Curated annotation (Swiss-Prot):
Organism from which the protein derives: Aspergillus fumigatus (strain ATCC MYA-4609 / CBS 101355 / FGSC A1100 / Af293)
Pfam families: eIF3g (PF12353), RRM_1 (PF00076)
Molecular function GO terms recorded: RNA binding; translation initiation factor activity
Annotated RRM domain residues: 210-288
Protein's name according to its UniProt entry: Eukaryotic translation initiation factor 3 subunit G
């Protein structure tokens, strides 16, 4: 009898009892219209079990990306991620929106003014959303001080000052030492700035004569590819490919500087009308600043 009693106790131990704190497993059902219905359970703030039903529709969005970027995505994972499936791992990667931070030149002053004015002035983002940086030399979306052609091409203001009337030399140099007015005048607009022989371009004058302007460039073009195309005709000293700040794609034009003008002329003759990435390149000498 003792053995039978022990067996009965063992049978009772094998019985499975429902745990009130356990949640049912998630259920995923595929519908006829292609959507999925996901049923899950959770506890709310009051400790009650809540059933959550979600209907998920999968949408495929195709976008054209740089072929080199697509190639890097197909590389096999290495390190701690070696052997994992392609794509980001949700255990180690959090996919979010790519936010690019671009502060303005005087963002500290604007932030201080916004704090003093209060919420009625709006946020800094609302104040700066319509402002864009424009280079005074090549009209690109970057600061003039960072322009790669600042030594070979003159700014627009300097070109206007060079064409000033000769009688302007008699005007006192406002803004200089000992000036009577408090207004500041840039050095290139002061007395004698437009006189002949004072512009010292030096070695960059030669680079200015050997610079080509290439238009109708593909959006997927790279500076290294343009350098390889033009280095066949001579030594290339500088390659500048204008890019869009938001998409980082080429804006359709580039500047190629050669060490020798003869090589630049030969490259202009051969590459003008050349087919590159299903587009016909237009190559000409960059306009020299007067």
């Amino acid at each position: 009898m003792s053995r039978l009693g022990n067996r009965a106790a063992d049978w009772a131990d094998d019985e499975e009892f429902d745990d009130p704190s356990a949640l049912p497993a998630q259920q995923v059902t595929t519908n006829k219209d292609g959507t999925k219905t996901v049923v899950s359970y959770r506890f709310n703030d009051e400790g009650k079990k809540v059933k959550v039903t979600r209907r998920i529709k999968t949408t495929v969005v195709r976008e054209h990306v740089n072929p080199q970027v697509a190639e890097r995505r197909s590389w096999a994972k290495f390190g701690l991620e070696k052997g994992h499936a392609a794509g980001p791992s949700f255990d180690t990667t959090s996919v979010g929106e790519n936010i690019v931070f671009r502060p303005s030149v005087n963002w500290r002053v604007q932030a201080a003014e916004a704090e003093k004015a209060g919420p009625e002035k709006g946020s800094i983002k609302d104040q700066l959303k319509d402002k864009k940086v424009k280079c005074r030399i090549c009209s690109g979306e970057h600061f003039t001080a960072r322009c790669p052609f600042k030594d070979t091409m003159a700014p627009v203001d300097e070109t206007a000052a060079a064409g000033a009337e000769p009688g302007a030399d008699d005007v006192p140099a406002a803004g200089g030492l000992g000036a009577g007015t408090s207004s500041y005048v840039p050095p290139h607009l002061r007395k004698g700035a437009a006189a002949g022989g004072e512009r010292m371009a030096g070695k960059y004058e030669k680079d200015d004569l050997a610079t080509l302007r290439v238009t109708n460039v593909s959006e997927l073009a790279e500076e290294s590819e343009l350098r390889d195309l033009f280095e066949r005709f001579g030594r290339v000293t500088r390659v500048f490919l204008a890019r869009d700040r938001e998409t980082q794609r080429a804006k359709g034009f580039a500047f190629i500087s050669f060490a020798d003008r003869t090589d630049a002329a030969r490259a202009c003759e051969k590459m003008d009308g050349f087919g590159y990435r299903h587009l016909i390149l237009r190559v000409e000498f960059a306009k020299r600043a007067t």
